[in-house]
């Protein structure tokens, strides 16, 4: 598969993106009520969710296909630059939580993506995933491989 630009970024600094940014931030705030121990975030982008989740966990791994612009420094935090799937840099049965917000709609092989997530989760581990609801949008997003 050729690499296609399918990434979206949102920022709280740009007023035109504030609604999108707030929607993303709410997901992180809700996840912060649930996560603990060792987590993986797939599609961490600019890393603005880290400040919500990092205080709640022992180990935080971030994966994104683009070079990190994360400004956080912590012994608990590891960044991996990688396309997904596969999650070949993550050991099987090693994580308590995987969080991935507004990512699956950008993944060509979504079935393999989910299989890989469950491979790296410990037994009883939890996946926290969000994706836009296609029935609640006005038009198809051109950045999405598919919508759910």
Regions found by a protein language model. Give the residues of each.
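A short His-aromatic
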Residues: 102-106
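Acidic carboxylate diad motif detector
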Residues: 129-131, 135
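Acceptor-substrate binding/catalytic loop of class I
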Residues: 138-148
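Conserved N-terminal segment of class I S-adenosyl-L-methionine
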Residues: 1-93, 97-101, 111-114
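A short glycine-rich, Lys/Arg-flanked "PGG" loop and its adjoining helix->strand segment in the class I
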Residues: 111-126
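Short, solvent-exposed loop/helix junctions and linker helices
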Residues: 21, 107, 147-148
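Short catalytic/ligand-binding loop motif for oxyanion handling, primarily in non-cytosolic enzymes
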Residues: 49-50, 135-139
């Amino acid at each position: 598969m050729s690499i296609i630009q399918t990434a979206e970024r949102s920022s709280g600094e740009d007023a035109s993106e504030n609604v999108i940014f707030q929607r993303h931030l709410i997901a992180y705030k809700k996840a912060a009520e649930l996560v603990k121990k060792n987590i993986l975030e797939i599609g961490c982008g600019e890393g603005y969710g880290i400040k919500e989740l990092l205080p709640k966990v022992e180990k935080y791994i971030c994966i994104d296909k683009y070079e990190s612009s994360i400004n956080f420094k912590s012994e608990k935090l590891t960044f991996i630059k990688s396309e997904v799937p596969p999650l070949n840099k993550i050991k099987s049965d090693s994580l308590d939580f995987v969080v991935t917000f507004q990512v699956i709609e950008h993944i060509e092989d979504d079935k393999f993506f989910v299989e890989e997530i469950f491979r790296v989760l410990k037994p009883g581990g939890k996946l926290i995933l969000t994706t836009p609801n296609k029935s609640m949008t006005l038009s198809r997003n051109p950045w999405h491989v598919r919508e759910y």
